[in-house]
Amino acid sequence: MLFRSKLERKSYEITKQYYFIEDWKASIAESKNFISSYPNSPKAEEVFYINLRSNYLLSKNSVEKKKEERLDKTIESYLKFIDLYPQSKYLGEADDIYTTCKKLKEELNSQKNGL
């Protein structure tokens, strides 16, 4: 059990480290690994939020060609997050991310349609 706890803590710290150095792709990958390996961890909610925020920041800073797909992934991540953690302390920030992503998608669609 102690060994698993150390591995869990290490994975958590790596996820946070990638997030803080703004390596969004690595943060997303490591947070997914953490969530699949330790779904019942007390840190799972925070790591899922880091995953959501990393998806958002990656999509926001993407080239136009990849932006829509990444916005869709962020919205999907948000929907999973609120399904799993409807009373989360991160709910306000998560809702803001969702609202911003919807607006960005609308802007992209209106640009595509020449409006």
What do the PLM-derived regions correspond to, one by one?
Residues 1-115:
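Acidic, polar-rich low-complexity tracts and alpha-helical solenoid repeat scaffolds
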